């Protein structure tokens, strides 16, 4: 997806998906289109749930099939489906690379993984959907450390566009490594979404 498309999607969903989108939404905090400034009236329950599902999907950069698959897995686990869903999404390797401030956006985090720059417990992992377990250590491959994106990360260059590193991650930015110390709690995860509406969306299908 192009930068322009992500910015337009950010405005439509009401959540910034990239740093560029965040800057634009400060100036235009309403959906794109001629009638964007006006509040949408008469949205059906389905439309509200659909929009919330799209917000969650957009923040993790997933295709519909991917999000639906994680939801069905979350339902099979003991506990609340919505909380399980966010926890599972947050433990994806690409999501954690973003949360640890190694990247500026979820799309960049995914590229870093796919391009084989990331090690988990010393082994190369190139699957963004890889589920990191508590106690595992993630670091940048030594040969990749000199690359510009990682030098920016090591200097704390993404701090201006990202929320603080959450408590479930123990990060060493200078060393370009981090450890998932425990499973994340929904209240700690910096995503904007009413997860219950997402659960209701899938439950009604």
Swiss-Prot record:
Ribonucleoprotein recorded as keyword: yes
Q: Which GO terms describe its cellular component?
A: small ribosomal subunit
Record CDD domains: S4 (cd00165)
Domain S4 RNA-binding residue range list: 91-149
GO terms assigned for molecular function? rRNA binding; structural constituent of ribosome
**Do you know which InterPro entries this protein is assigned to?**
Ribosomal_uS4 (IPR022801), Ribosomal_uS4_bac-type (IPR005709), Ribosomal_uS4_CS (IPR018079), Ribosomal_uS4_N (IPR001912), S4_RNA-bd (IPR002942), S4_RNA-bd_sf (IPR036986)
Can you supply a Gene Ontology BP term from the record? ribosomal small subunit biogenesis
Question: What domain of life is recorded for the organism?
Answer: Bacteria
The UniProt entry, under PROSITE patterns, shows:
RIBOSOMAL_S4, S4
Keywords for the protein's UniProt record, in alphabetical order: Ribonucleoprotein, Ribosomal protein, RNA-binding, rRNA-binding
| Classification via Gene3D superfamilies | Ribosomal Protein S4 Delta 41, Chain A, domain 1 (1.10.1050.10), RNA-binding S4 domain (3.10.290.10)
The residues the entry assigns to the signal sequence are none
Entries under HAMAP family matching the protein = Ribosomal_uS4_B
Q: Which PANTHER family match?
A: 30S 40S RIBOSOMAL PROTEIN, SMALL RIBOSOMAL SUBUNIT PROTEIN US4M
Q: Which NCBIfam families match?
A: PRK05327.1, rpsD_bact
Give the record's subunit note: Part of the 30S ribosomal subunit. Contacts protein S5. The interaction surface between S4 and S5 is involved in control of translational fidelity.
The protein's role, per its UniProt record: One of the primary rRNA binding proteins, it binds directly to 16S rRNA where it nucleates assembly of the body of the 30S subunit. With S5 and S12 plays an important role in translational accuracy.
The family annotation for this protein states:
Belongs to the universal ribosomal protein uS4 family.
- Stated name of the protein: Small ribosomal subunit protein uS4
Give the organism the record lists: Tropheryma whipplei (strain Twist) (Whipple's bacillus)
Q: Which gene encodes it?
A: rpsD
């Amino acid at each position: 997806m192009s930068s322009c498309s992500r910015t337009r999607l950010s405005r439509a969903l009401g959540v910034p998906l990239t740093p560029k989108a965040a800057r634009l939404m400060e100036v235009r905090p309403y959906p794109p289109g001629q009638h964007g400034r006006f509040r949408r009236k008469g949205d059906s329950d389905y439309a509200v749930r659909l929009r919330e599902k799209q917000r969650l999907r957009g923040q993790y950069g997933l295709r519909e099939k991917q999000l639906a698959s994680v939801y069905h897995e979350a339902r099979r686990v003991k506990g609340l489906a919505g909380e399980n869903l966010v926890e599972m999404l947050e433990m994806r390797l690409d999501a954690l690379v973003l949360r640890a401030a190694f990247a500026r956006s979820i799309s960049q985090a995914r590229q870093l993984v796919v391009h084989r720059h990331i090690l988990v417990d010393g082994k190369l992992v190139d699957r963004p959907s890889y589920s990191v377990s508590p106690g595992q250590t993630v670091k940048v491959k030594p040969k990749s450390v000199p690359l510009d994106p990682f030098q920016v990360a090591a200097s704390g260059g993404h701090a201006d566009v990202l929320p603080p590193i959450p408590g479930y991650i123990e990060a060493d930015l200078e060393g370009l490594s981090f450890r998932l110390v425990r499973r994340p709690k929904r209240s700690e995860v910096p995503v904007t979404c009413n997860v219950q509406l997402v659960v209701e969306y899938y439950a009604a299908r």
